[in-house]
């Protein structure tokens, strides 16, 4: 592998991915995701937007203190205050980057920035010079680049390269481009930019037309050597380019691209499951690479072919991306050491003995209810327990549901708010409605339920149900998750989890105009 054919994987799940409605994560959840991304082998972890809020600063700083192999990066507007906060946040990281940006399209410069092109160049150069005071690794992004005039882009990119930028990122901020245009754009821009051969060129594509991955691959054909992407394609609006799809496209079609990454592809599925569970965004079954049906064959002809020779209908193996062939994990007789070892095999790290003991206690409870415990059960169980430990405001204790044909169901629920036990009862049009009404009779959150969904964690009637609840209040949207073999218990846990996150998000206001690329 040479530098010329090595693709840098820049993961922005913790920054751009978190901008999905309701996907906000706590500091502890971000650290868990960052650790998994490091195991996955991503080169750059964009840990957040340090200047957006004190909570964001703390999360970026905590990740910078935790990660040792990947580069830790913070996004920053081309504003001195933002850049200095980013520099301070990533300071503890052995490898650090500041990623600063400013809009360059005519419509953004005129209506959003209200700046002339010359002023934009001056601001960009100043930003890069300040960032270089903190690190030699500085990335500059031209927001809305694919709708910018290419001659102006070449001018501003040349100026920031001279000022010390080492990576130039060209975002398709609104997902407007199409692949052949993207490839042409990169080829022309790299040639036109003064000293364009001295930096790494990067693509950051959004999925508004469903072309984020295709455009990212086209950018690589056009000369880019970094792609910015997220696990499961998570991101605002239609999402971002999916890291798993880009990586596997480069691996499976190495004959066409001749490019390499440093990704451990067997960590793709564990990464997908962790991000899905923490954010409350389920992976669609037919999602490429990580969907539950990605390696399923229903056609008899296909099944026969796969049994005779897998490559007849499979262009990659399920094992190569982290799907286990034997997912049966543990049983009721399994001990604490076996449990701990299995979690490590799954890439799950618990921060303390207290957390391990709590998760093991939950495992034993589950083992009494469910004869066979699979990897997916452990992911759901640990995420549910960690959420319970970290979200201190609202905690589930117990509940009783009474239903009879022709009568309204009744929910009697016991939960705690900041350690104080509460009891509530309510009837509803169904048991779920009764649970939510009972909780709200005490919580009085004023939130609106946007989404309620239940997914079976594994196959079979004994499966755990993983429940997601999305609540909205004002301009705040949060997702809550719960898991249990009793889906009504999982439902109550998910609602209480969402209430805790709603309170958490209210306590960490974002900076005005923090922006995105």
Swiss-Prot record:
Region (Regulatory domain): 395-517
Record-annotated membrane-spanning stretches: none
EC number in record: 2.3.3.13
One of the GO biological process terms: L-leucine biosynthetic process
List of residues binding Mn(2+): 16, 204, 206, 240
Cofactor list: Mn(2+)
GO annotation, cellular component aspect: cytosol
Pfam families: HCS_D2, HMGL-like, LeuA_dimer
Subcellular location per the Swiss-Prot or TrEMBL entry: Cytoplasm
Main location: cytoplasm
Pathway: Amino-acid biosynthesis; L-leucine biosynthesis; L-leucine from 3-methyl-2-oxobutanoate: step 1/4
Catalytic activity reported: 3-methyl-2-oxobutanoate + acetyl-CoA + H2O = (2S)-2-isopropylmalate + CoA + H(+)
Family to which the UniProt record says this protein belongs: Belongs to the alpha-IPM synthase/homocitrate synthase family. LeuA type 1 subfamily.
Function, as annotated: Catalyzes the condensation of the acetyl group of acetyl-CoA with 3-methyl-2-oxobutanoate (2-ketoisovalerate) to form 3-carboxy-3-hydroxy-4-methylpentanoate (2-isopropylmalate).
Quaternary structure annotation from Swiss-Prot or TrEMBL: Homodimer.
Name of the protein in its database record: 2-isopropylmalate synthase
Organism: Neisseria meningitidis serogroup C / serotype 2a (strain ATCC 700532 / DSM 15464 / FAM18)
């Amino acid at each position: 592998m040479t530098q010329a054919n090595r693709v840098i994987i820049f993961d922005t799940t913790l920054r751009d991915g978190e901008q999905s409605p309701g996907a906000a994560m706590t500091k502890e959840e971000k650290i868990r995701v960052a650790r998994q991304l490091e195991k996955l082998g991503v080169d750059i972890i964009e840990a957040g937007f340090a200047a957006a809020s004190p909570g964001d600063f703390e999360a970026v700083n905590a990740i910078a203190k935790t990660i040792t192999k990947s580069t830790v990066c913070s996004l920053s507007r081309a504003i001195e205050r933002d850049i200095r906060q980013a520099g301070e946040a990533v300071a503890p990281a052995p490898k650090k980057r500041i990623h600063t940006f400013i809009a360059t399209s005519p419509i953004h410069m005129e209506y959003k920035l209200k700046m002339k092109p010359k002023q934009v160049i001056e601001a960009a150069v100043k930003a890069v010079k300040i960032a270089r005071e903190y690190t030699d690794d500085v990335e500059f992004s031209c927001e809305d680049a694919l709708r910018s005039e290419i001659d102006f882009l070449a001018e501003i990119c040349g100026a920031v390269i001279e000022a010390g930028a080492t990576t130039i990122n060209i975002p398709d901020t609104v997902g407007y481009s199409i692949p052949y245009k993207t490839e042409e754009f990169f080829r022309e821009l790299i040639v036109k930019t003064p000293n364009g051969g001295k930096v790494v060129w990067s693509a950051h594509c959004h999925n508004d037309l469903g072309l984020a991955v295709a455009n990212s691959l086209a950018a690589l054909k056009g000369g880019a050597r970094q792609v910015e992407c997220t696990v499961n394609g998570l991101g605002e609006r239609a999402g971002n380019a999916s890291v798993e799809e880009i990586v596997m496209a480069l691996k499976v079609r190495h004959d066409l691209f001749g490019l390499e990454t440093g990704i451990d592809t067997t960590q793709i599925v564990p990464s997908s499951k962790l991000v899905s569970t923490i954010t409350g965004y389920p992976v669609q079954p037919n999602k490429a690479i990580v969907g539950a049906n990605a390696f399923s064959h229903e056609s008899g002809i296909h099944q026969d072919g796969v049994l005779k020779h897998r490559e007849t209908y499979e262009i990659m193996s399920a094992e190569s991306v982290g799907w286990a062939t034997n997912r049966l994990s543990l049983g009721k007789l399994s001990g604490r050491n076996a449990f701990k070892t299995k979690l490590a095999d799954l890439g799950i790290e618990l921060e303390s003995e207290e957390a391990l003991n709590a998760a093991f206690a939950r495992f034993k409870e589950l083992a009494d209810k469910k004869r066979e415990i699979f990897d997916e059960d452990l992911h759901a169980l640990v995420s549910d327990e960690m959420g319970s430990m970290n979200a201190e405001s609202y905690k589930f204790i117990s509940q009783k549901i009474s239903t009879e044909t022709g009568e309204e169901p009744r929910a009697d629920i016991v939960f705690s708010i900041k350690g104080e036990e509460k009891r509530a009862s309510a009837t509803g049009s169904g048991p779920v409605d009764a649970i939510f009404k009972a909780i709200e009779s005490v919580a009085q959150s004023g939130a609106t339920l946007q989404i309620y969904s239940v997914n079976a964690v594994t196959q079979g009637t004994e499966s755990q149900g993983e429940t997601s609840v999305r609540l909205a209040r004002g301009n705040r949207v949060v997702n809550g998750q719960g898991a249990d073999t009793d889906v009504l218990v999982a439902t109550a846990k998910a609602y209480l989890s969402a209430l805790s996150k709603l309170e958490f998000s209210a306590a960490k206001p974002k900076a005005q105009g923090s922006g995105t690329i």
